[in-house]
Amino acid sequence: MSNNWLERTTLLLGEDKLQLLQRANVLVVGLGGVGAYAAEMIARAGVGRMTIADADVVSESNINRQLIALHSTIGREKSELMAERLRDINPDIELTVVNRFIKDDETDALLDSDKFD
């Protein structure tokens, strides 16, 4: 895929910095009110690898504040919806989807599962 969609980022940061972003690997845990917006902006910045984690499903009460919450998405898994959205923004993104809640005692294992920037 062409990187034309990143031309404004390249103008702002330069080619070398864009390549750093494209090699970066980011972890986003929780895709609710803040996490989904963060994940989307990270993807739009050109980050090349991302792990997203959430086990929740969209409920009607999420619609007023969550990016992926729509009447048409009620009952669907937030992690899968976000994955679809991120791949639509950047088809080249390497995405790992963790469809479970991350408990305190699992944090270290998740952080050790990959090299995150």
Predicted regions located by residue number:
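N-terminal charged helix/coil linker that caps or initiates catalytic domains
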Residues: 1-26
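Electropositive phosphate-/nucleotide-binding environments in soluble metabolic enzymes
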Residues: 3, 11, 15, 32, ...
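A generic local structural motif
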Residues: 12-16, 39, 104-109
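Solvent-exposed alpha-helices and their adjacent loops that cap or buttress functional pockets
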Residues: 19-20, 43, 110-113
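Short amphipathic alpha-helical segments
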Residues: 39-41, 64-65, 111
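A structured beta-alpha segment of the ubiquitous adenosine-cofactor-binding alpha/beta core
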Residues: 75-116
